[in-house]
Amino acid sequence: MKKIIILIPVFNDWDSLEKLLGEIDETVKDIKNIFIECLIVNDASTIIPPQFIKPNNIKKINILDMRENRGHARCNAFGIRYVNENEDFDNLILMDSDGEDRPIELKLL
């Protein structure tokens, strides 16, 4: 089974993130032999993250909290380092939580 980690930095925009997770979950439901994990890097948000409803097709959601706001690029770098040091995976995908990236393109993998 192929393991794909989707790294998503977020700062306060939890509603957009929840929508994105729903779109990812819907997109991957028909993809066979795949394990999808989402790693959310919280860029020291001042709004407390909500409890997410457990998606059906995303197997795991982790949230890493930055101690201070460092910006989008630093969140990506922190997440990439974390994944390389702590996870066994086949592919790492970076997505923005603001809806700019299209989860439908996951089907092209």
List PLM regions with ranges.
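Short, well-formed alpha-helical segments that are part of the catalytic scaffolds
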Residues: 13-29
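A short, amphipathic alpha-helix embedded in the catalytic core of nucleotide-handling enzymes
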Residues: 24, 95, 102-109
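Short beta-strand-to-loop acidic/aromatic patch adjacent to the donor-nucleotide binding site
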Residues: 88-100
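Conserved donor nucleotide-binding strand/loop of the catalytic core
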Residues: 53-86
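Short beta-strand/loop segment that forms part of the nucleotide-sugar
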Residues: 32-44, 64
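Donor nucleotide-sugar binding loop of glycosyltransferases
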Residues: 13-17, 45, 102
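Hydrophobic targeting segments
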Residues: 2-8, 17, 24, 36-41
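A conserved acidic beta->alpha catalytic loop
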Residues: 42-50, 99-100
